[in-house]
């Protein structure tokens, strides 16, 4: 008999600031690796169409985001890090249930995310360029750092 949580959570895709079902409308069920009868939750079974929608929404949002002053972007990223810190224990427990990772290692993974968010927030205050002398008397070379655009990554998070 499958054991479910008091309330099985159904997770949707966050695209364009809205929680939406997958293009197919299908979901899949995730089970605890420690107990295959324990349901972790139900998740949107996404496809290439969903990925394209997400990338397009991110590209559209980037046009506004890139105009936000770097120190303000830094504050937003710092708040994200502080939220991770506030919910560290529950996030670590969720990771343990979902992946079978030992709790102390999951706590370490969440701490790495917290540390990276705080680091990135600090970098928001260092969005400056540099100038260097040029070969000609009345000229100089200038480099300015600026956001490039949407980046998609797939990271491994399997365990052990």
Labelled PLM ranges:
Residues 36-128, 138:
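Glycine-rich loop-to-alpha-helix module at the N-terminal edge of alpha/beta enzyme cores
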Residues 1-35:
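Hydrophobic face of amphipathic alpha-helices that form TPR/SEL1-like repeat modules
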Residues 32, 45, 145:
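Conserved strand-loop elements at the edges of beta-sheets that form or border functional pockets
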Residues 13, 21, 96, 118, ...:
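Short glycine- and Lys/Arg-enriched binding-loop motifs that mark or flank ligand-binding interfaces
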Residues 14, 43, 131-132:
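Short clusters of hydrophobic/aromatic residues that line enzyme substrate/ligand-binding pockets
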Residues 23-25, 42-43, 135:
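Short linear motifs in exposed loops
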């Amino acid at each position: 008999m499958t054991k479910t949580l008091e309330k099985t959570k159904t997770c949707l895709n966050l695209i364009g600031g809205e929680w939406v079902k997958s293009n197919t409308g299908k979901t899949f069920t995730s089970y605890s690796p420690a107990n295959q009868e324990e349901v972790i939750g139900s998740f949107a079974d996404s496809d290439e169409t969903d990925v394209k929608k997400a990338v397009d929404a991110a590209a559209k949002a980037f046009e506004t985001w890139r105009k936000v002053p770097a120190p303000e972007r830094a504050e937003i990223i710092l708040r994200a890090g502080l939220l991770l810190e506030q919910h560290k224990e529950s996030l670590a427990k969720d990771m343990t249930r979902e992946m079978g990772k030992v709790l102390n290692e999951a706590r370490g993974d969440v701490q790495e995310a917290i540390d990276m968010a705080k680091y990135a927030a600090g970098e928001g205050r260092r969005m400056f360029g540099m100038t260097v002398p040029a070969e000609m008397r009345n000229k100089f070379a200038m480099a300015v750092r600026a956001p490039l655009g949407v980046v998609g990554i797939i990271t491994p998070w399997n365990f052990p």
